[in-house]
Amino acid sequence: MPMSDYLDAGNEELLKDFFSEAEQQVEQLESNILVIEQDPTNRDAVDEIFRAAHTLKGGAATVEMHELSGFTHAVEDLLDGIRSEKVTVDGAVVDLLLTSLDVIKAMLESRAGGGPYAEDVSDLVARLRSYLPASGTVPGAARGLSVSSPNAAEAAKGTAVGEDGTEAPQVGRVPPLSLLSEYDRLELREIVPPEHSVYALTVRFDESNLMNTVGGIQVFTALKSCASVLKTVPDFDALYQDMFHEYVVYFVSTVQDSVCVSQVASIPDVTLSVSVAEVALADLCTPLSEHGELGVCADAGTGGVSEGSGAAVRSGGERVPNSLPKQVAGCAVPSAKDSSKATSSGYGSGSVLRVDAKRIDYLLNLVSETVIIKASLNQSALEFGEVYTLFQNANGAYKERLRKFFDRVPAYLEKVKNGQDADAVRKGMIAEAVGVFDIFSSFENGLKQSVTKFRSSAQNLGRISGELQEGVMKIRMVPISQIFSRYPRVVRDLSRDLRKEVRLVIEGEETELDKSVVEDLLDPIMHCVRNSLDHGIEAPEVRARSGKPAQGTLLLRASNEGNMIVIEVADDGRGIDVEAVKTKAVERGVLHPGKNLTEVEAFQLIFAPGFSTSRSVSNVSGRGVGLDVVKTHIERLNGTVSVFSEVQKGTRFVIKLPLTLAIIQGLLIRVGQEVYSIPIASVIESHRIKSEEINRIDNYEVFNVRNEVISLLRLDRLFGISCDDEVTGQYHYVVIVGAAEKKVGLMVDALIGEEDVVIKPLRDQFTSSPGIAGASILGDGSVSLIIDVGQLLELGLKREILARERREATVW
C-alpha cells in the first residue's frame, strides 16, 4: 500500500515533510540518550529527548501513523518520569530507550515501505510502564498532554454564563495553564512567533446537536482560518473519536484580537458558549501553583464559520494549519543548530535538502546581477550592430574612393611623364591615399569602445557565473555530522558486544561536502570503524598489560585540504604487523616471497579482496570482505584510501575525496583528434619525453623519473584511436596520474590546459566502457570523455602482475 493511501493525495507533501523531520527527531533522540548515559544529570539532554519524542509523536498523529504515535506515547511517559526525576537513569533504562528507538526506526521504515508496523510491541510497552510510579500516572496512550495535577480535569469545569443562560468554563477562575505540564508550557513559548498573541479558548458544546461528536473538529476547522491551533484538551486524537466532549480547550496563536477569535469559534447549533483568556508569553515560563492565577476573560460573541486550509499536527496530536507562516511551521525542530543535522536512513526522504536561507538570498542577489549583465550584453549587441552598419558604410565608401584613386593613377603618371616634379606628384598621391584610409577612423573608434564595453561585461559575467556556480554547489553542501552522528550508537553497541571500553572522539563534524558524497560515505566509514573496534583496540586486560589505559580511543576527524575533504578513522590499538601482512599475502598468492615491499606498500595489501590477518571470524569482522569494499566505494567517488600504522601505537585510515562530484577541475588532453579530461586531483605531474627515453620490461613500456620506474599506458592503443605516427613519433607527452602509492604514466599527443568540467553520467552501451568515468561538454560544444584514473591504475597493476607471473614461469 503506498504512503498516499494513509492520507488523501493532497497531503503527500505532508508525508514527505514528516519523514524528513522524523530523521532529525530520531537523531536527536539517539544522540541525547547516549549523552545521558554518560551524564544522567544533564538536564538539557533530557529536555531535548523529551522534546524530540513529543514532536515525533505529534507528527505521527498528523499522518495517521497511529501505531507510532501510540508507542511514542509510552516512551514519552518514561521520558517524563526521567525529566521529573521519578525515574533514575541507569544502564537498563538507557538500553530500554535505545531498544524503543530501534522500534521507532522500524515503524518509520515500515510505513515508508508502504505498510504499517505489524510486530507486537506490548511487551516492550509493559517494560516502559514498569519504570513508572504505580500511582498518580496517566497512561500515555490515553492522553495527549501532560496533566499537572489530579484536579486538572475538574479544573476545566469552572462555570460562566453563556448566551443561552447555561454555565460554561470560566477560564479567569480556573487558569488554562493548569491544564498543561511544565514542558507543555515551555513548548508553547518556544513555538509561538513574537508577533503572535496566545489565547486559551474554552468552548462548551451543545449535546442536543445531532452531530455533537464532531463539534470539536468543527471548531478546530473554523479556527484554522484565523489562528494556529497549538494544543487542545482533550487531545486531538480524542476529538476524532466518536465521543461527545462537553468542554474543549483550544490553545491558539494569532495576530487577530480575542473578539475575532471568539467569533470564529462560535458556531450556531454547535457551541453553547466560548470563553477566551489571553496567555502572556512570560507566564509560560513561570511555574504555576495548583490554582495559580492567570488570564483575562472575554465573553464570546457569536459569529459565522470560516473554512480554513488543511492542518498538520504540532505535537501530542494537536494540529497546525498547513498555511502557517514559516517561522511557526518550522518550530517543531528543537533548535536552529539541530535543524542542519540529518541522518541517512531508509525511511528518510533522500531528495529533501535543507538549505540555509542566507545561501538562497545570496543566490537571488547574484541572479539580480545577471539581469544587469544581460541588459549590458544586449546593449553591446546593439552597439556591435551599429558598428557593423558603420563598417558596411565605410567599406562601401572605401571601395569607391579606392576605385577613384586607381582611376587617377594614370593621370599622376602622365604628370611625371610631362616633366612635373616626381616628389610633388608622389606627395599628392600619398595625400589622396591617406584620405582613403581615413574613412575607417570613425569605425575603428566605435569598434574599440564596443569591444572595451563588451570585454568588461564578459568579465563581470565570468565573475558572476563563477560565484553562482560556487553558490549553487554550496546549496548541495551538508555537514558531515549527518553521518558522524550515526557512529556513537554503533561504537557503544559494538564495544559492549566485544567487551571493550572505547571512547569515541569526533572532530570537524561541521565540515561540509556534497550531499551525494555524504550518502555514499556511510558504509566505507562503517567498515573502518568496525575494523578498528574488532582488530585494532585491545581488550581492557590486554591494554593494561601493555601499559595503556583500559579505555581505548577511536577518533573520527574530517577536514578540508583545498578542494578535497580528508576523513580519518584512527585508533590507539595494537596496530598492524607488517610481517604478518606480508606472510598472509604470500600464503594467499598475492605477493611473491622474494618481493621487497615498503611499509606503505605492505599496508595497501589489506585492501585486497578477501584479505584478513585475523585468525578467527567474529560477528563483527574477520572474513576479509570489508576493506576491499571501502577501497571500491571510495575509488568510485574519485577518492583514495590509505592506511598508516605503528605496532602498539595504533592504526589510521585516511580517506580523501573531492568536495563535489558534479563539477571537477580537469586537465584537457588530446589523443589523436579526441579530447579527454583527467581529474586534476589525480594528476601528479607531466613530462615531455623523447622516444629513446622509453624502455621495455617484459614487453611493457616504462620510463624513468628521478630514479623511479613508471609504467606507461598509451591511451591511443587503449581506446583504439588512430594517431599520426609522424607527429607523435619523436616526442611524447606523459601525464603521471596516481592514487595512494600507485602511479602510471598516460601517453598522450598534446596537453591543452585546465578547465572546470561538468560531469555527465554515461548511459546505455557506454556505461561499461573501461577507463571512462563520464562525459562533459566543452565550451566549443564538443564532447570530452572523462578518464577514470582508478580503473586505469587497476589496469596497470594487472599488467605488472601478469609480467611478474611470466618472469616466475620463465625462472621455473
Swiss-Prot record:
CheW-like domain spans which residues?
A: 663-798
- The record places domain Histidine kinase at 418-661
Q: In this UniProt entry, which cysteines form S-S bonds?
A: none
**Pfam families found in the cross-reference section:** CheW, H-kinase_dim, HATPase_c, Hpt, P2
- Catalysis performed (reactions): ATP + protein L-histidine = ADP + protein N-phospho-L-histidine
Phosphohistidine PTM positions: 54
Q: What is this protein called?
A: Chemotaxis protein CheA
Q: Which species does this protein come from?
A: Treponema pallidum (strain Nichols)
